[in-house]
Regions:
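Domain-core and long-helix interface of multi-subunit machines
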Residues: 3-22, 91-186, 190, 199, ...
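Extended, basic/helix-rich recognition subdomains
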Residues: 237-276, 304, 311-314
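Short, charged, surface-exposed secondary-structure boundary motifs
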Residues: 75-84, 155-158, 183-185, 200-205
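Active-site regions of enzymes building and remodeling cell-envelope glycoconjugates
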Residues: 63-71, 143-144, 188-191
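Conserved catalytic scaffold of divalent metal-dependent phosphoesterases
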Residues: 70-74, 83-88, 119-128
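An N-terminally biased module of ancient metal coordination in phosphate/nucleic-acid-related enzymes
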Residues: 1-81, 182, 269-314
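A conserved mid-domain beta-alpha-beta active-site/ligand-binding segment of alpha/beta enzyme cores
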Residues: 197-252
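Short, conserved acidic/polar surface loops in the N-terminal third of protein domains
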Residues: 58-59, 77-85, 97-98, 129-131
Length: 314
């Protein structure tokens, strides 16, 4: 059973690029078109991971092989932000996840209590801003999975993410992270023998998952940006007046691509030079132990934290 675990649609909202965040969307992918393309490419189950949104569910809930997920912007105890994929949720989970997303500890407590599978995405990317070395301690202790292949990241960043997942003993997942329709489904996760969504995630936790598909590249990134610009021009014809600025796109994407490579090299080198640390929550934040109820136990092992039945109960 195959699934692209990182896909975007028009419901992902506006882009985060300064100057464009008022007029341009993160993605113009139509949810139904995404669904049909994924099925055509052999995905047995389908999800969409829009940024802090589950609006696509209204269109796709009629499909029995669709399950609800989202990509959550989460604030770490260090003040940095990361993108966390949360899978097979219910609509009520989305409300609580959004309420807690500015508090990593609170969010992890909820996800663990609800036995929801989650991952840190594009761990070696600068897309969410700067990173703190202590963030990796949190990942090592309280995140069950890392995105080890992202269809928009360079091969080196993906290799570093895969190595980190192996080093921390985490589940490795893959997804296209495609904001343009052309890349949807080209990177995916497979669990041989799985027949349902529940069996798929159980197989991941049991270590039977495999990652497949394309890495990112400068040409691919540039083509995706031009695709988004084309969709913007169709949605807002008045933007034709600023269309000559599109000539700058190859320079913009080159700068972004080089920065991503630099970011990945910097952090992979720092982690290689540091001693592997898997700390308890109160080792990272001494006063955090006081925040945890006596009856609550973090599941450090994947089996104990996520349990045998991974789907959220209705």
């Amino acid at each position: 059973m195959r699934c692209d675990l990182h896909v975007h649609s028009v419901a992902s909202g506006m882009c985060s690029t300064p100057g464009l965040n008022r007029i341009c969307r993160e993605s113009y992918n139509d949810a139904v078109e995404v669904y049909k393309r994924l099925r055509t490419l052999g995905m047995a189950i389908v999800t969409i991971t829009d940024h802090d949104s589950i609006d696509a569910v209204e269109i796709l809930r009629k499909y029995p092989d669709f399950f609800l997920s989202e990509e959550v912007t989460v604030r770490m105890p260090t003040g940095t932000e990361v993108h966390v994929g949360v899978y097979d949720i219910r609509e009520r989970d989305h409300v609580e996840i959004q309420r807690r997303r500015n508090d990593f500890i609170s969010l992890v407590m909820y996800l663990t209590e609800r036995r929801l599978f989650f991952s840190v995405n594009h761990v070696f990317s600068s897309l969410t801003g700067h990173r703190d070395e202590r963030d990796f301690d949190w990942f090592a202790s309280y995140v069950p999975a890392l995105e080890a292949r992202n269809g928009q990241m360079c091969r080196k960043a993906n290799a570093d993410a895969a190595n980190l997942a192996a080093r921390f003993g985490k589940v490795a997942i893959a997804g296209s992270d495609s904001h343009a329709i052309a890349g949807v489904g080209l990177t995916h996760t497979e669990v041989p023998g799985a027949r349902t969504v529940e069996e798929f995630f159980a197989g991941l936790v049991q270590g039977r998952g495999r990652i497949h598909g394309a890495h990112g590249g400068y040409a691919k990134l540039t083509a995706d940006v031009f695709s988004i610009i084309n969709s913007l021009l169709q949605e807002k014809p008045w933007t034709l007046a600023i269309s000559p600025l599109a000539l700058l796109v190859p320079f913009f994407t080159a700068g972004h691509w080089l920065n991503e490579i630099r970011f990945s090299r910097k952090w992979s080198a720092m982690l290689e030079d540091s001693e592997k640390r898997t700390q308890h929550l109160w080792d990272v934040a001494p006063h955090a132990h006081d925040l945890i109820p006596e009856h609550f136990s973090f599941g450090i092992s994947l089996e104990s934290s996520l349990g045998p039945s991974l789907g959220a109960s209705a």
